[in-house]
Every structure is written in C-alpha cells, then in structure tokens.
C-alpha cells in the first residue's frame, strides 16, 4: 500500500470513528433530555391505572445515578405513596413483654445538662419511635430546678426526641404545655398542648408543625388531656380531655381531629363516673382507652370510641385484680365491670391495660399504696368476667424497693400485626427524696413478645447522693 492509500485509509477510518462518536453523543443527549423531562409514573395499587407522581406526597426522594461514557444521568424514581394509618391488622399474640429502651436521664443529669421532666410517654410514626415529656423549663443542675414538684407553670413545654435519646439542651420544644398528647396519622404529627391559667386554660392543636385549631376551658377547672399518645384512624385522630374536679364530678369530652382541625366533640357516656389521663390504643375500626378514676374507683374505666359515628360508651375493667394506686389488697379488691368499686378511689395514678380476647393484660405498681415497683401480668377472663382474679405470666419490671410513677401504652405496627408496648415513668427527687429540691424522671420501655424472656428489674438507678441538690 502506497503512502497516499495509507493516508486515505487512515482518514476514512478516522471519519467513521468520528461519525460513530458523534452519533453516540447525540444518543446520550437525547437519552438525558428524555429522562429529565419524562414524567415519572407510578402504578396505583387501587385501580392499576398510571398516575403522575407530582400530586403525591413524597416520603423519600430516591435518586439513582447511572454512569454512561463519563456522562452522569440522574433518574428520579417514584416515591412511596404516604397514606393515613388505619391500624387494621390484628393484635399480636404475646406471651409477655421484653425490654426495649431505657434513657437513664437522671443518672446522666449527675454530670450533664439534662432537662427536668415529668409525664413522659412514647409514640411512633410509621418508621420510628419518639419519647415525649413535659419539661420544667430548666435543666436539673440549675437553680430553676428548685420546687419543680409543681405540675402547672407557664414555662413547661412538650419535649420530643428519638426514643432512647435523653432530653439534652438540643432537644426540640414542640409547644407550650403542662398537659399533652401526641400521635401520627401516617402523614404528620398532631400535638395537643394544654397551657394557661387553671381556671381558663387553652388547648392548642398543632399539626405538621403549624397551629391549626384551639379550644378553651369548658369547666374552668384545669383542662387536661391524656399524657400519652392519641390515636388516628384513616385521617381522624381522637383524644380524651377532661375539665373539672379531680376528686368529684368532671366534664370529660372526646375530641375528633382531622389534620389539626376539630371536627366533632362527643360527651362521655356510659357508666364511668370519673375519667382522666387515658391510655388509648387502636382497636380497628375504633379506639379503646383505659383511664384513671380519681374519684370513686381503683378499678380502671374503659372508654370505647366509635370513629365512624362519634358515639361513646364507657365501663370498667372486669378484673378483680385492679390496676390503680392506691387500692385494696388483691384478696379484698373487686370489680363488677360496670361501676367504680368505691375502694380507695380518691387519688390515683395513670396506667394502662388492653384486652386480649376474654383476658386482659395490665400493668400496675407493686405497692398497693405508693408509686413503688412495677409489675405486669395477664388476668384470665379479666375482660369479660366480673371480679376475675386468675393471674398468669407475671413479670417484675421495677422491684418494689424502687420508685415508679405514671405508665401508659403505645402501639407499633409490624408486618403482620399490631404490637402493644408500654413505658414506666421512674420518678426521682421530691416529695420522697428530700435531700434534693427537684423532681424529675427517667423512663423504661417494654414491648410485647411472642418469644421467651427472663427476669430482672430496671429501676432509675441514680444514686441520689451523687446528684445536684
């Protein structure tokens, strides 16, 4: 091949290569533009029709990056559809409760800036659990912590952290509140926050970080709510609120809220005589609450809430092993399912229970007179049989030598069933421990298990002599 032919051959090959490269670049450009402007489509599970993603609420915005000849193409995939929770799965079958979380707030307060709190509770969104408490507007190692035994001051705020994270200085203050409830409807958080004068308090309803509605005191006597999670089904949330005497007749109302707006209010009906500090759980399609009778009964009231027609019924837990403190000893205590037992009814403590077929799972202080120790057990026939006392599967959560406090329920949706969990408030400081001037708490959390479990005790554990005064 002579030199001219070589030059022509090389030139031809070069032109072919250049043309191929040019066509590839055009193809890459077309692909990039197409992917950029192509409307993302998602298959609707309800009717198998293709719908655009734009009007759908985005939970996670996932980006896939594809590398093609040094050209980066970002492909935005369709996000998951975020829906209201309906809690339609069955309740998990359990053999007892297993340890889940403990925040050790008081022990950590001996050497760190941790909030002074009380009235803690736990609630979960569809992906994560959070702990809440009512802060006293001060850390423990701070002179403002003196005399924080008082419940209602204007500096109290609702605190919110991931479960297991103590309330440190960076903790979010959700709202102003000395009484509260929170729940997630599947799309956003609802917070019910009560604050103000005892005789004319205000409940603010905060949804998705915005104040949406409010309601004032209707009996001018300490408007108050659950101190544990509310419950939302298909976009409607319900919360139990009481205004009136803590040791006599009070006015309890059940509020129904949609995206922060009050849509209906139902009065309490049924046989319950006094209801406050309810611990509520979803019982699809309705909601059930176990509450505190601070007037006549040491057996706990039940409030059944119909989420469709807003009707209310109430009664009392049938178990003769009653759940409130103070109470009679187990040999003499009783309950007939319909009425308060008139046994040491004046005063009490927030608590919980939940139905399990004919039986009832419940928790209570070990001491019948003081907020000391904590135990759980199942009462056979305790949901339907008056004065039933057959106890099985007893567990000690906090031994009787250590302090406890409020307790409440929260629900967690699993793949196939809804699990019931509970928390126990571990109170320290005044009034029992007078070496210090503050009153605060830590928490311990357990959840239902179908497995086996051992024994133990999970008290607060702080040495009061190590603590700031």
Curated annotation (Swiss-Prot):
Residues 334-343 have a biased composition (Polar residues). Intact N-terminus is essential for virion morphogenesis. Possesses two apical sorting signals, one in the ectodomain, which is likely to be a glycan, and the other in the transmembrane domain. The transmembrane domain also plays a role in lipid raft association. Catalyzes the removal of terminal sialic acid residues from viral and cellular glycoconjugates. Cleaves off the terminal sialic acids on the glycosylated HA during virus budding to facilitate virus release. Additionally helps virus spread through the circulation by further removing sialic acids from the cell surface. These cleavages prevent self-aggregation and ensure the efficient spread of the progeny virus from cell to cell. Otherwise, infection would be limited to one round of replication. Residues 91-469 are annotated as: Head of neuraminidase. Belongs to the glycosyl hydrolase 34 family. Keywords: Calcium, Disulfide bond, Glycoprotein, Glycosidase, Host cell membrane, Host membrane, Hydrolase, Membrane, Metal-binding, Signal-anchor, Transmembrane, Transmembrane helix, Virion. Residues 31-469 are virion surface. The keyword ATP-binding does not apply. The influenza A genome consist of 8 RNA segments. Genetic variation of hemagglutinin and/or neuraminidase genes results in the emergence of new influenza strains. The mechanism of variation can be the result of point mutations or the result of genetic reassortment between segments of two different strains. It is a single-pass type II membrane protein. It catalyses: Hydrolysis of alpha-(2->3)-, alpha-(2->6)-, alpha-(2->8)- glycosidic linkages of terminal sialic acid residues in oligosaccharides, glycoproteins, glycolipids, colominic acid and synthetic substrates. N-glycosylated. It is an enzyme of class 3 (hydrolase). Inhibited by the neuraminidase inhibitors zanamivir (Relenza) and oseltamivir (Tamiflu). These drugs interfere with the release of progeny virus from infected cells and are effective against all influenza strains. Resistance to neuraminidase inhibitors is quite rare. This is Neuraminidase. Its EC number is 3.2.1.18.
């Amino acid at each position: 091949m002579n030199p001219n032919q070589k030059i022509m051959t090389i030139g031809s090959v070069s032109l072919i290569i250049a043309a191929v490269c040019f066509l590839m670049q055009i193809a890459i450009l077309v692909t990039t533009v197409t992917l950029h402007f192509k409307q993302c489509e998602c298959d609707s599970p309800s009717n198998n029709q293709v719908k655009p993603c734009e009007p759908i609420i985005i939970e996670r915005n996932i980006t896939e990056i594809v590398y093609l000849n040094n050209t980066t193409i970002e492909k935005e995939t369709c996000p998951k559809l975020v829906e209201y929770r309906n809690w339609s799965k069955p309740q998990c079958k359990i053999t007892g409760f297993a340890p889940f979380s403990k925040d050790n707030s008081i022990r950590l307060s001996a050497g760190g800036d941790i909030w002074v709190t009380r009235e803690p509770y736990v609630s979960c969104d569809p992906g994560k659990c959070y702990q809440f408490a009512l802060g006293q507007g001060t850390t423990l190692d701070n002179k403002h912590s003196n005399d924080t035994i008082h419940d209602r001051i204007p500096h109290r705020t609702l605190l919110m952290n991931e479960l297991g994270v103590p309330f440190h200085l960076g903790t979010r203050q959700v709202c102003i509140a000395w009484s509260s409830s929170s729940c997630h409807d599947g799309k956003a958080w609802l917070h019910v926050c009560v604050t103000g004068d005892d005789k004319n308090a205000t409940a603010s309803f905060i949804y998705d970080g915005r104040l949406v509605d409010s309601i004032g005191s209707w009996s001018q006597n300490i408007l108050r709510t659950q101190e544990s999670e509310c419950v939302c089904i298909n976009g409607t949330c319900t919360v139990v609120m009481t205004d009136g005497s803590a040791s006599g007749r009070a006015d309890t109302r059940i509020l129904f809220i949609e995206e922060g707006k009050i849509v209906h209010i139902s009065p309490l009906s049924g046989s319950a005589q006094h209801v406050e500090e309810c611990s509520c759980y979803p019982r699809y399609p309705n909601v059930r609450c176990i509450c505190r009778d601070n007037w006549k009964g040491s057996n706990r009231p039940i409030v059944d809430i119909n989420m469709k027609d807003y009707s209310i019924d109430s009664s009392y837990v049938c178990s003769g092993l009653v759940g409130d403190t103070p109470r009679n000893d187990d040999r003499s205590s009783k309950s007939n399912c319909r009425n308060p037992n008139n046994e040491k009814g004046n005063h009490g403590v927030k608590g919980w229970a939940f139905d399990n077929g004919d039986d009832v799972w419940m928790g209570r202080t070990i001491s019948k007179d003081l907020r000391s120790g904590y135990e759980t057990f199942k009462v056979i026939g305790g949901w339907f049989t008056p004065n039933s006392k057959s106890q099985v599967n007893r567990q000690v959560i906090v031994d009787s030598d250590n302090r406890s406090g409020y307790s409440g329920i929260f629900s967690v949706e699993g793949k196939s069933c809804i699990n019931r969990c509970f928390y126990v408030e571990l109170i320290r400081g005044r009034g029992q421990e007078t070496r210090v001037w503050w009153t605060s708490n830590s928490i311990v959390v357990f959840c239902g298990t179908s497995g086996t479990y051992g024994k133990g005790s999970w008290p607060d554990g702080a040495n009061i002599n190590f603590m700031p005064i």
